[in-house]
Amino acid sequence: LAEAGGKGIETGMTAATIQLGKMGIIHGARTYVIQNEDGQIEEPYSISAGLDYPGIGPIHANLAAQRRATVLAVNDDEAIHAAYELTKLEGIIPALESAHALGALKKLKFKPENVVVLTVSGRGDKDIETYLSFNEK
């Protein structure tokens, strides 16, 4: 599972809920939540508006808790660079949400005989301003 690492999980500007969250209740679901010591939900951060959410779905939380899923925090830089690579090589502009999954691929090791399937959802054209402004930095 790829989660939004934001500016890095050590910075506090992140939405890496599984890695940094504590068990809590959000929107009626018991799951990992980014919260302070008093249990108050804190504002997460991600370059992707679709990923800056302080909770995680209970199914993903359970898979992570049982160690049935590998969870990787992908920071903004990694996601953007992975998106640029897909766009350059394949002509596909991924949405920022999918760019995080692409960024996770770089952190994994595969054997030549492995079959890897990654779905690219959404449309990157809605994120074009973010991609362009990131490139100007």
Which residues does each predicted region cover?
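Short, electropositive, low-hydrophobicity segments enriched in small/polar residues
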Residues: 54, 95, 126-128
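A short, acidic, amphipathic alpha-helical segment used as a generic capping/interface helix at domain edges
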Residues: 76-81, 100-110
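Active-site/ligand-binding loops adjacent to catalytic centers
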Residues: 3-92, 133-137
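Catalytic phosphate/nucleotide-handling subdomain of diverse soluble enzymes
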Residues: 2, 10-11, 104-137
